[in-house]
Amino acid sequence: MIFQSWISKSAVAATLVLLALNVAHAQPLKNEAAAASNEFTPEVGQAGKDVIWVPTAQTLVNKLLELAKVTPKDILYDLGSGDGRTVITAAKRGARAYGIEYNPDMVELSRRNAAKEGVSDKATFEKADIFESDFSNATVITLFLLPSLNEKLRPTLLNMKPGTRVAANSFDMGEWKPDQTARVEGDCQTWCTAYLWIVPAKVEGTWKTANGELTLKQEFQVISGTLRTGDKSLAISNGKLDGERISFAVGVAHYSGRVNGDSIEGISIAGTAKTPWNAKRGK
């Protein structure tokens, strides 16, 4: 689901013409059976709370879940779940999947779709506002929102457990650059880019190590800083966070490890020598 409701009428009209031509195959017109049963059938461009609805092509749904490496061990939340296809696809992969959707008709449609696909036991849909919902137990978040809404969600996402995967259709997170990007073709004609972010651990600050004081600066998943040993201060390079995993270099030594709250444990490699290292966050 994309597009804020305040976009000008002419811009919306032009956009809908384009979308109707390119995604009509993904959004069939009301058929006789639906009309006869009075079941709700969504239409491309229908108004929503913050956005209008445009379906995500199934090939892109598959790519989003592939990038996020969704397994039966995951808990997935789709923020603005529309007709439920992302949630249903995740449930088919064995994940516990939840859709948060403001439109009650779309929620009921999603529940019917889940029942038809035989995954009602794993796919749950709730009528709610994504900005007022608690999805803190998620291991995977998926979304299809404008950048302004993504950025509004960004602080909440960054406060989630390190290693949580965030997969988005076509729109980015501003200064928080994606860890992976992929494009799909096939049945996808518009909005065909998949982005993946991995929520990084919070490491900015001073850490005590056996080799001296490690001072880290953090900008999302990128880290910089210095290691001070005695009267020497050495800059770190190639600093990166991948969820709880941290890596950087100091001179010829390459450090890797896992962040666990206020401690880090790992291995440093210099030439052929491998040495365990650990750090404690300064108080």
Report residues per predicted region:
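Bacterial N-terminal signal peptides that target proteins for export
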Residues: 2-12
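S-adenosyl-L-methionine
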Residues: 25-74, 104-137
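Conserved class I S-adenosyl-L-methionine
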Residues: 72-82
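Conserved SAM-binding loop of SAM-dependent methyltransferases across substrates and taxa
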Residues: 83-95
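Conserved SAM-binding motif I beta-strand of class I
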Residues: 96-101
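C-terminal substrate-binding/active-site "lid" region of AdoMet-derived donor-dependent transferases
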Residues: 150-202
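Central antiparallel beta-sheet cores of small beta-barrel/beta-sandwich binding domains
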Residues: 201-283
